Amino acid sequence: MNKSLFSLILLIITIFNLASNINIVSAISNFNINNNNKNNNDNKEIRFPTDIIIDDSTEINFNNHEDNNNNNNNNNNNNNAYNEDSGNSVQLGDIECVVCLDFLDSYLPTLVKIISEYGVIESCSKICGLLNKTDEIDICTGLCDLVGVDTFWKIFVTNDINPFYACELITACSTPKNPAADFISLGVSPAIGQSGSKFLIDLTFQVVNTTGAGQFAFIVFYTQTQSKFINYQLFEGFSPGNYSVKYDFETTNNSTFINGQYPVTVYMCNGECGTMYSTLLNQTTSYFTISNPTPTPTPTPSNSTTPTPTPTNSTPTPTSTSTPTSTPTSTPTPTPTSSSSTKTHSSHYKNKINK
């Protein structure tokens, strides 16, 4: 099967999928999301070329690769690169490259397992027939026919094979000899924000020599925890010209983003960044700053109590004064004239004393 016939088959499959509400050209987005999730879930070290230098002041450890789960808030937006000259979205590369990358992003481990277990298989239809779905079998067979079964199965026993390199070996993706790009500027806006803010990372670059399919890697370093967030954006290829690519990075309002400066590094790679088969086209670093307002301290109630006034007895204490007792003057007792009058006088005196 020649390449033009394979392109026709893929075009028919694409039309069929579009009719079934399945957009095969969304391979760029799907590949990027799947690849990012796969790398983060495996929590593997990202292997950048040794010539990439990180400023020692950032104290970054590449071995601590994590996708901050608050970055589920970081939607994996695939902002396509735009040509600064025409303003049109870049759509380079043959349909074979997009389909191949999307297909192998899902089925490369399966094909590696099939070929490892069954050994040399004499036909493309037998290798691909071990897949489960008709569409995948057709795409696999078409890719296999591009290079022939003898070359096809050997690709999947190559050490550290990845979808980009496999698609280049299959000839579905172009392999320019001297891809080159210059970075013009990298901006982050706003330059200063609070935790929970969204920051727009905007890269402007110039492609000097045509590139093949590759990736942008947007890396935000969390200096507090010595970890990082990585987002990959796939591109099919660029012809010479000026372009820009953007990525929205959303922070979270928690202890990850304390006050301080956060480095943002962008890599552009021909192929899959960090692998032995990729070419680093360029890199640059910028920063944004988190500046949260200082919380106003809440006044603490004092433990000292207001003294309670002691009530004073306003009623004066009566002063006891002795009432002088008059001593009755003894008067001569008249001589009773009769006994009855004497009794009456004695009784009256007794009563007066008892009162």
From Swiss-Prot:
InterPro entries assigned to the protein according to its UniProt record, in alphabetical order: SaposinB_dom
SS bond list: C97-C173, C100-C167, C128-C140
Residues spanning the signal sequence: 1-27
PROSITE patterns on file: SAP_B (PS50015)
Keywords, sorted A to Z: Disulfide bond, Glycoprotein, Secreted, Signal
Compositional bias per record (Basic residues), positions renumbered to this chain: 345-355
Ranges where the record places region Disordered: 63-83, 290-355
Protein location: Secreted
Compositionally biased spans, kind Low complexity: 69-83, 301-342
Sites where a glycan is attached: N132, N209, N242, N253, N254, N282, N303
Broad class of where this protein is predominantly found: secreted
Domain Saposin B-type as annotated: residue spans: 93-177
Family: Belongs to the countin family.
Name listed for the protein in its UniProt record: Countin-like protein
Natural source organism: Dictyostelium discoideum (Social amoeba)
